[in-house]
Amino acid sequence: MGYINNNTGYLEHHTLSSRSVIKKNMYALITPDGLVKNNIYGFENCDISILSSPLLGASFTDYIITVKENGRNLCGIGNESEEIFLFVIEGSLLVYNDNEKAGLTAGGFFFSPASFKLYFQNNSNNNAKILLYKRKYKPLNNLSPKTISGNINNIPYKNFEEMDSVFIKDLLPANDFAYDFNFHILMFKSGAGHGYLETHIQEHGAYILSGKGMYNLDNKWYGVEKDDYIFMACIFF
């Protein structure tokens, strides 16, 4: 149900329900069903939904966006204090800031540091589906992050915590303190899972790119599947 699934209006033999769960300042499971379109200045010919924001309890904002043919943002996203990360889930997109330009395809990503606005446009005949992340940058000493672009298909998986059934690939330098956050892909073989329930200060956003499974949030198990979004808050407020 909802615009993402092209299933709107009156539905026969259907009772209003949702798998989505919202626990402000704790966690959220947001499914594609029920997402509504938002109108945001600068986004032209785009269907956009806000997944998380400071109103939910996050220090960042995540958007899921369908960029239609000739869709674009030429006003620029971000400002002198905001960093931007864009990930292409489907389709292709031209993405650039003031010092780098990249033609991205599915799996492509672009990190734009604070002080550089990010721009994009869809020059293809097909829709592009993207995840967009925006956050206020917290500088450390005189360290300065650089623009980074790439594609996850060119990054090899590594064993996650020495397990042979869970794998990870980092999209940003994990040990460079110029970068105050990271994006990574986790891949689980069938039946695999984390070795323990994580309890830590870091907050997370997570987008399920494929498959389905179970996720434990505040000691409650939830079924999750492709295109679901999860927000996990910091354990201290």
What kind of feature is each model-predicted range?
Residues G2-T61:
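An N-terminus-focused feature that recognizes amino-terminal "leader" regions
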Residues G2-T8, N123-V166:
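Double-stranded beta-helix
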Residues K37-G76, K158-L197, Q202-E203:
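A short glycine-rich, His/Asp/Glu-containing loop-to-beta-strand
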Residues C46, L56-A58, E100-K101, A114-L140, ...:
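Ligand-binding loop in jelly-roll beta-barrel domains
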Residues E69, E80-D98, I201-N219:
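Glycine- and acidic-residue-biased ligand/ion/polar-headgroup-sensing regions
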Residues F85, D98-S115, D218-I235:
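Short acidic-glycine-tyrosine-enriched beta hairpin
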Residues L94-Y96, A102, F120-N122, K189, ...:
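Long compositionally biased, domain-poor regions of proteins
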